[in-house]
């Protein structure tokens, strides 16, 4: 039986991600014009390249699939909605790791997820400076540059290495009582270590490769998580909400791990913060 979405991933999403990545890499050699999305988050940056790449991705897909829906980071920032419907929907982060991009820190990715009936069917994450193309298709496995991926399978959190990020919130009280205290609780279990790469999509792909045993973060958006979520699960990993419940793409928080045991153990340690959902429904508690 023909798998139309597999073909869509292989011959459209991958080629568009690679083309977008070449634009990003070229822009890294030029002066970057930096903007701040909101005065409430002075570390939440955006550049003209983010906007250019997203427009290119959406226009390329619309040529072939004019009836499809789109949720893009820069489109939402400009006032577009981010409600996920049953319609085939492309969920796009043109540059995941914009702060890395601004500083030329070499971990930036183009992230393209595709959902039908609110379920992610496939994801493509192109870590363009590294030239690593991560793909995951529901029920078909996940790969990096054609090599099949498998999580570490680690179940003992005391033998784990975990990735997280401090995010863009620079409120001193928040940093002290939430961000750093969550890290402290995990380090004191103890665990082997905590790392930060600066891009949610690549962080999750590192879990899929087995290079890290887990990644957690709160304050994300659906475009940060969509593509990589299926890459992790197809590599044998577990995706949960930060509370330990079922993962919800619109919840703005995630734990992705090599095993359910580690994911649930992390959830027990985390102080949960209230977050506005991407779909505008009631605030997460």
UniProtKB/Swiss-Prot annotation:
Q: What protein is this chain from?
A: Inositol monophosphatase 1
Supply the PANTHER family for this chain.
Answer: INOSITOL MONOPHOSPHATASE (PTHR20854), INOSITOL MONOPHOSPHATASE 1 (PTHR20854:SF26)
Q: Which residues bind substrate?
A: 73, 95-98, 198-200, 217, 224
* Its biological purpose: Phosphatase involved in the dephosphorylation of myo-inositol monophosphate to generate myo-inositol. Is also able to dephosphorylate scyllo-inositol-phosphate, myo-inositol 1,4-diphosphate, scyllo-inositol-1,3-diphosphate and scyllo-inositol-1,4-diphosphate. Also dephosphorylates in vitro other sugar-phosphates including D-galactose-1-phosphate, glucose-1-phosphate, glucose-6-phosphate, fructose-1-phosphate, beta-glycerophosphate and 2'-AMP.
Q: Does the keyword Cytoplasm apply?
A: yes
Cross-referenced Pfam families: Inositol_P
**Assembly and binders:** Homodimer.
TM ranges: none
């Amino acid at each position: 039986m023909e798998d139309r979405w597999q073909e869509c991933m292989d011959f459209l999403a991958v080629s568009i991600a690679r083309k977008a990545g070449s634009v990003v890499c070229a822009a890294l050699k030029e002066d970057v014009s930096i903007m701040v999305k909101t005065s409430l988050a002075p570390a939440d940056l955006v550049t003209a390249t983010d906007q250019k790449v997203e427009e290119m991705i959406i226009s390329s897909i619309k040529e072939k699939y004019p009836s499809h829906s789109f949720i893009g980071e820069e489109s939402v920032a400009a006032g577009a909605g981010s409600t996920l419907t049953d319609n085939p929907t492309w969920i796009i982060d043109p540059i995941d790791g914009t702060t890395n991009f601004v500083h030329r820190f070499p971990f930036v990715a183009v992230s393209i997820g595709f959902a039908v009936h609110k379920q992610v069917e496939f994801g493509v994450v192109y870590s363009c400076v590294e030239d690593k193309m991560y793909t995951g298709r529901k029920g078909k496995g996940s790969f990096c540059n054609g090599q099949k991926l498998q999580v570490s399978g680690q179940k003992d959190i005391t033998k784990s290495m975990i990735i997280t990020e401090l995010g863009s919130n620079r409120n001193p009280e928040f940093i002290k009582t939430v961000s750093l205290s969550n890290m402290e609780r995990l380090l004191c279990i103890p665990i082997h270590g905590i790392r930060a790469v600066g891009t949610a999509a690549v962080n999750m792909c590192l879990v899929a490769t087995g290079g890290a045993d887990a990644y957690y973060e709160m304050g994300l958006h659906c475009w940060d998580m969509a593509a990589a979520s299926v890459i992790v699960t197809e590599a044998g990993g577990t995706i949960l909400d930060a509370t330990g419940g079922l993962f919800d793409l619109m919840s703005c928080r995630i734990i992705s791990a090599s095993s359910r045991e580690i994911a649930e153990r992390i959830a027990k340690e985390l102080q949960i913060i209230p977050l506005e959902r991407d779909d505008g429904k009631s605030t997460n508690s």
